[in-house]
């Protein structure tokens, strides 16, 4: 038990050091360089060395206690910056995936709506071109001929660059993850939101490890974009920070798209390979996955809706029996009825 706790503490310390302290310490170093160099002499290494030497010769850090305090302050500052980057990373991840963009603030929601509309128009144009090439290829095969594959492949690539499915979100990464839900519903009538918690509990350990690693890679990629937001204010003191910001944004965007694609691919593969295991454990049979079995599995896993709330007691109906006479009491304003949230309509 002691060895296990020691190993766990070692791994936690390594993660704390690699995810928070080291990136935060690099940010503090760049910040110090930005303050020391400024805009006029951004790459003057002798000036930077001189400023650092003067700071090191300060009486406040000359003693052993001062150095300890300085080291603790640097570690705390680096960890604080790392935590800020993690928090910003959560926000940038929400922006990249845009799963709840209709609930965003009005201005941001309006922008997301316009971007989604433009992406839909581009995708539909590319999809029409791709389907035209497919129809031409099918007609040629019916005549015993063949058409060139390159135009058809190029048209499909152009469509996929916009979105793998009909765009429903303002970002490519969001549509890539959402495409898993669309495809499973279209191919097997599966509701991924209802199926996934049950499927996760039945997946083999190595599959869950791969999916968790892909999810963490997506989080790290979006956090890289968050670091770009932290480096951007340094451009007010040191203009090369603008270049650092641009590099981080481009790298973060590329990694986010790649990580989202990998994560979505693993999600879809896990469902297609192991959804039958869930059906078998629930006693629904182990037949090959089909639309019929997917319908049955979705119905079995979808929770029932809340019952219809009782009728407001303040309302009367002609069929109700007359109430027994009671002693009059001071009037009380009626409580308005609660609207049924998600109640099934008949």
Where do the protein language model's features map onto the residues?
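N-terminal first transmembrane alpha-helix
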Residues: 1-129, 133, 143, 346
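Cytosolic/matrix-facing juxtamembrane and C-terminal tails of multi-pass cellular membrane proteins
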Residues: 1-16, 47, 206, 210-217, ...
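General structural signal for secondary-structure boundaries
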Residues: 41-45, 64-66, 196-205, 290
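Juxtamembrane "helix exit" motif at the C-terminal ends of alpha-helical transmembrane segments
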Residues: 28-47, 86, 224-250
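Membrane-proximal, non-transmembrane interface segments of integral membrane proteins
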Residues: 89-221
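Transmembrane alpha-helical segments and their cytosolic interface motifs
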Residues: 9-24, 187-243
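Long, hydrophobic, amphipathic alpha-helical segments used as structural scaffolds
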Residues: 92, 96, 233, 275-278, ...
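Pore-lining and gate-forming transmembrane alpha-helices of multi-pass membrane transport proteins
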Residues: 70, 74, 233-237, 241-257, ...
